[in-house]
Design a protein with these regions (language model features):
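Active-site helix of classical SDR
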Residues: 127, 163
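Conserved glycine-rich cofactor-binding loop
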Residues: 24-25
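Residue(s) in the substrate-gating loop at a strand-loop-helix junction
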Residues: 147
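C-terminal helical subdomain
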Residues: 187, 203-238
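Substrate-binding pocket helix/loop in short-chain dehydrogenase/reductase
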Residues: 103-105, 111-116
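Conserved glycine-rich Rossmann-like NAD(P)H-binding loop of the short-chain dehydrogenase/reductase
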Residues: 38-55
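Rossmann-fold cofactor-recognition segment
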Residues: 59-73
Length: 260
């Protein structure tokens, strides 16, 4: 019983209706290409219509729906369009995100609000938008892209890590409420992935992987029906072990490892 998949495994993508929000670059673009190659019916959303259009060759049948995840009315309008076009949505992936490496003394109101709006409030509003139709059908899946930065406090992740920690909590609570109603909930917690966002980092990123590798890990986790899909394991397992340390030891170790 303990080994039973927590979610319904997704193994056959042919004709599966997937709305990917945050599809223009990095993990989102790589996942869009991987899903298109497996026959999924795609709707791709991001703020940049130009970057979405650049995916047209890899995803020629995809519906392109430019939007800003922080604008609830835009998400709702796109959702209504998809319901009218498809009749339902099988999986919504909330991948839109923003990141600024900040120390505590660099905090400002604009950075706080932007990060929370994109990384947390936008996905929460998005779930509130898509959920009623899924509940009416008694089927569907929601995937939220978090981060291992949400496991515990880390230097330079004061806003980003906080938003991802809250998103992980949100995903866990969603699962408890929705699994009995036939809705699958996945939380995807990557380590370091080579993307335009992580290109801002001026420090060595352990176990750095490509966006294509990340997309493959996500598909493998969905196929296993895992609640939490975390990768690369050689890094994320270490981060999970650090969750068990008492704070005195954790703080000391992180200072030594980061040199901060």
């Amino acid at each position: 019983m303990l080994l039973r998949a927590l979610n319904t495994p997704i193994t056959d993508w042919q004709g599966r209706r997937v709305w990917l929000i945050g599809a223009s670059t990095g993990i989102g673009a790589a996942l869009a290409c991987a899903l298109a190659s497996r026959g999924a019916k795609l709707a791709l959303s991001a703020r940049s219509s130009d970057k979405l259009a650049a995916l047209a060759d890899a995803c020629p049948e995809a519906l392109l729906l430019p939007l800003d995840i922080t604008r609830r009315e835009a998400v709702a309008a796109a959702h209504e369009r998809l319901l009218a076009h498809w009749g339902g949505i099988d999986l919504v992936v909330f991948n839109a995100g923003t990141y600024r490496p900040l120390r505590a003394w660099e905090l400002d109101a604009a950075a706080i609000r932007e990060t929370l709006a994109v990384n947390l409030i936008g996905p929460m509003d998005g779930v509130a938008t898509v959920l009623p139709a899924m509940l009416e059908r008694g089927a569907g899946a929601i995937a939220l892209v978090g981060s291992v930065a949400g496991y515990r406090g880390l230097p330079r992740a004061i806003t980003y890590g906080s938003s991802k920690a809250a998103l992980i909590h949100f995903a866990e609570t969603l699962y408890l409420d929705l699994a009995p109603r036939g809705i699958s909930v996945f939380v995807i917690n990557p380590g370091f992935v080579a993307t335009p966002l992580t290109a801002q980092n001026d420090f060595r990123m352990p176990a750095l992987i490509s966006a294509d590798t990340a997309a493959g890990e996500i598909l493998a986790g969905l196929a296993r029906g895992e609640f939490e899909i975390h990768f690369p394991k050689r890094f994320t397992r270490v981060m999970k072990a650090l969750q068990c340390l008492p704070r005195r030891l954790y703080f000391s170790l992180i200072r030594k490892l980061t040199g901060l």
